């Protein structure tokens, strides 16, 4: 892990070396990172993949910094340890930058706190850069009922660097035809043998589901997709199977896969994975109790690796094909959803997964969540239907990231 320190020092202080004047802070940073000093005149030689901090080494550099405004890293992270009047200069610089719409932050104080903050900023930077250039396949088209889940492809690319790629379902149908039952026999046996039970569905249904999985994965490889969202209900009309098993296994393979052509939710899944390394469970808030502050999240697919055990079921709405009833571990969870046509809004909360439910009138994988914030959000100010649940409390990590990217938090 490398930090590029862009150094600004007054000519009045050049007789004192940067290293000796700031030994304490530099030695501490070097315990965790490789530090490369970059003269401010050379900062334009750095690439967008380089993590940069502006090192305010002395006072008297205020005008020098603003003269290089166009080349400064964004956001502007100013390191000032207090030596050589550096804090005084950093205060002036930060105020000037923020007055011109640039996010700015001063790193100063206890060494341990500075290091923790650098860790957070570095992880945010790495996550943001990892999103850049990612291709999200939109296989088919968004479901007609997702009227509030649109994304403007161009605005999303400008903000996040991601690319939504439209792929016709005919590509999947063609690959599906080429896959034979014999090719998927072993995979079907593996999924069936590890299931806790099989309540509905036939061997033929499972074979079709596995052929679909192979077809989608092949297209993902051909299109170099990091993620996809599938128009799964239209599949049922054409090939008489659901996408539940395919999406489950694709997520286990590391290909982020969402349902119903939901453009906002698949980005949420991708961003969450970039920041935390965790896969999410995309689900419908199916029951909401604002008095007890509980909700039930439900959907017919979940990554098998997210479950403790799973049961093979059929699809709830159509009673066709194969769905997954995952039994998920109890404990702390995070609920998140990115919204807005340019993905500049988000909802974020935490809670406790208290039980796996088994209602007959909702999707197969069901979990009850006791929320740490008012569940009234879902009734009064929701960001659409689908929300993402991941195991663990990642509120601070996710909030820091979206705030740093000028997103508006909805509560």
Task: Please provide the spans of the model-predicted regions.
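Extended hydrophobic packing segments that form well-structured cores
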Residues: 323-411
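C-terminal catalytic subdomain
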Residues: 255-355
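Flexible loop/turn segments at secondary-structure boundaries
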Residues: 62, 86, 144-146, 234-239, ...
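N-terminal basic/disordered segments at the start of proteins
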Residues: 1-39
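Structural motif
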Residues: 6-17, 40, 55-59, 81-82, ...
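Conserved, well-structured core segments that form the ligand-binding/active-site neighborhood
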Residues: 95-275
